[in-house]
């Protein structure tokens, strides 16, 4: 999914969810999920709580301003429930080392593809295009996800997984190979200019060091990763043509080839060095615990001193201020070293304001975008609050946040407990990966990028599923739960098919419109409306068809139906005003324009200014 726009599109998520739920249902029906030992109660409780959160999202369709968006969000979280259940089941029957290796290899593959798209841009067609999600600054690396912070955070999640393989004593070759992509990942993080990626990596690595049984080996692997990262950034930093994405120039092309070669050599050197260091480490005695505690104390003191020296109060004030950074030759480093929150403080504040207006049940899933456009204090476009937890609070109220928090806390507690009990570096790496993801979800919209979210949720499920249980609960071996699980899987597939069918019909309608085939456009829009009658998008498409052939009355009627299904969408009111102007109903157009201005003062004022209207 990472390669398909980060799994952002509803149809992409629907395909993945159908596949995941089908595997769950088929596995339950064919008794593939039978484990040798019972599943822990935490591993049973977490998916149930997340499923309750998903049902609360579905229920919010009854009061949300746009049922289509709420339904899409329900299907999105349904995918994550499926991933969590599937991961828990897989953890019972597949060795953790295989699972960690597979996830690490997949993320490393994305990192390599992204790196090559910058240093050798001709390797991947479309790698130099702007994001389909955002109008990206070309200077920031975003291919193939389309969002630089998302890319940086995803590749950062590979660190605890790779470190766990390096710290494992199962295979010397695998341990050395795990060090190979370290400089590539660091290079990607620097080129994305994502401070969130470095924060997620730091939290995930610290979590791994805490959870790992052999902390000296884990610390040594971390030092090796740091050396690889510093070396990669040292090589890239002075090559401004490469950093700024000017790869069509001879200088940029030359710098790309040089950096590709140096980073490759760095990876090989680090891998060989780790192979030798690991062999040496096996022969050396483990330092006494007193040395370990002293080292930990030094690191804590150094961290606290660094925080104090950075003037945290001043940094916090800078974080709250809107960003004024612009594209420049030194943008990447300037942005990495800045303290600006890039509007996050304002986004978070409005999520809290939305909660205060609807404290119990929120305004409904998918409503934050409308609230932000109506109340935003700065001219920043954003569909999301850039915080999973604050957005859940604003959209779904205290009930939604408590359900989400309960699911995550139960799952994380089980994952951490599994890491400590099993003393497995792989389980520690999975738990740390999950901690890093859910930390990042607190300050960026990675939850909406399914390509990243399935990594975090999947790692959480795998660590949680590894938790042993000494109590044979009646549901513990799926004997009773198996038929129910199969039925739930079938039921969960149905809404995914609805989203998929409606999305494909609307995509076909867009293609037909681009080709001037109004008949096909209308038939596809009618099919989308039949599949998803609460979809305002389908009604808007039908209105556009009638408008193209001059049927103003039917177009206005269809637009009214769209407005009833998405009454806080200012664009629908704007289109209605335009149609009524053409119909000569100036009073109606004025009312609709006033409504659009109330729902989005900034954009409507800009459009009126362009049109020369008062």
List each language-model region with its residue ranges:
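Short aromatic-rich membrane-water interface segments that cap or initiate transmembrane helices
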Residues: 7-11, 62-70, 135-151, 249-260, ...
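Hydrophobic transmembrane alpha-helices and their immediate junctions
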Residues: 177, 398-428
């Amino acid at each position: 999914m990472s390669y398909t726009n980060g799994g952002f599109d509803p149809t992409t998520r629907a395909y993945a969810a159908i596949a995941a739920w089908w595997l769950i249902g088929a596995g339950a029906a064919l008794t593939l999920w039978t484990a040798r030992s019972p599943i822990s109660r935490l591993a049973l409780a977490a998916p149930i709580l997340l499923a309750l959160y998903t049902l609360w999202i579905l229920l919010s369709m009854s009061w949300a301003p746009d049922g289509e968006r709420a339904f899409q969000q329900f299907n999105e979280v349904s995918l994550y429930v499926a991933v969590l259940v599937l991961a828990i089941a897989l953890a019972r029957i597949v060795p953790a080392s295989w699972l960690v290796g597979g996830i690490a290899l997949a993320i490393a593959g994305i990192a390599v593809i992204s790196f090559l798209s910058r240093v050798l841009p001709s390797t991947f067609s479309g790698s130099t295009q702007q994001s389909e999600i955002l109008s990206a600054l070309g200077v920031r690396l975003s291919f193939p996800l389309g969002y630089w912070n998302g890319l940086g955070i995803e590749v950062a999640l590979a660190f605890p997984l790779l470190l766990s393989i390096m710290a494992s004593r199962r295979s010397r070759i695998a341990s050395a190979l795990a060090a190979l992509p370290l400089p590539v990942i660091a290079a990607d993080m620097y080129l994305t200019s994502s401070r969130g990626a470095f924060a997620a990596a730091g939290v995930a690595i610290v979590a791994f060091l805490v959870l790992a049984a052999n902390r000296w080996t884990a610390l040594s692997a971390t030092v090796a990763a740091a050396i690889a990262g510093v070396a990669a950034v040292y090589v890239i930093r002075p090559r401004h043509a490469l950093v700024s994405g000017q790869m069509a120039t001879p200088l940029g092309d030359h710098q790309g080839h040089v950096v590709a070669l140096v980073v490759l050599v760095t990876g090989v050197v680090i891998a060989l060095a780790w192979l030798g260091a690991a062999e040496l480490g096996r022969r050396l005695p483990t330092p006494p615990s007193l040395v370990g505690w002293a080292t930990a104390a030094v690191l804590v003191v150094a961290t606290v001193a660094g925080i104090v020296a950075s003037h945290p109060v001043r940094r916090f004030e800078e974080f709250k201020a809107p960003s004024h950074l612009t594209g420049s030759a030194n943008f990447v480093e300037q942005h990495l070293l800045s303290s600006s929150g890039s509007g996050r403080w304002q986004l978070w504040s409005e999520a809290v304001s939305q909660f205060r207006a609807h404290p119990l049940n929120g305004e409904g899933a998918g409503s934050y975008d409308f609230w932000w456009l109506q109340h935003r204090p700065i001219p920043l476009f954003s569909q999301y609050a850039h915080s999973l937890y604050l957005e859940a609070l604003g959209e779904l109220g205290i009930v939604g946040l408590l359900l989400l928090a309960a699911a995550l806390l139960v799952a994380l507690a089980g994952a951490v407990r599994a890491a400590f009990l099993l003393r497995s570096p792989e389980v520690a790496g999975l738990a740390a990966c999950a901690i890093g993801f859910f930390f990042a979800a607190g300050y960026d919209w990675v939850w909406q990028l399914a390509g990243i979210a399935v990594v975090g949720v999947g790692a959480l499920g795998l660590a949680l599923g590894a938790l042993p249980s000494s109590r044979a609960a009646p549901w513990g071996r799926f004997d009773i739960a198996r038929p129910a699980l199969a039925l739930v899987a079938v039921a969960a597939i149905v809404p995914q098919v609805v989203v998929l069918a409606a999305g494909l019909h609307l995509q076909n309608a867009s293609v037909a419109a681009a080709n001037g085939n109004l008949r096909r456009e209308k038939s596809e829009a009618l099919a989308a409306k039949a599949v998803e009658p609460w979809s305002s998008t389908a009604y808007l498409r039908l209105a556009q068809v009638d408008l193209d052939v001059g049927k103003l009355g039917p177009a206005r009627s269809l637009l009214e139906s769209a407005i009833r299904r998405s009454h806080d969408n200012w664009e629908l009111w704007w289109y209605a005003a335009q149609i009524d102007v053409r119909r000569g109903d100036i009073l109606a157009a004025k009312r609709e324009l006033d409504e659009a201005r109330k729902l989005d003062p900034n954009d409507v004022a800009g459009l009126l200014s362009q049109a020369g209207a008062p």
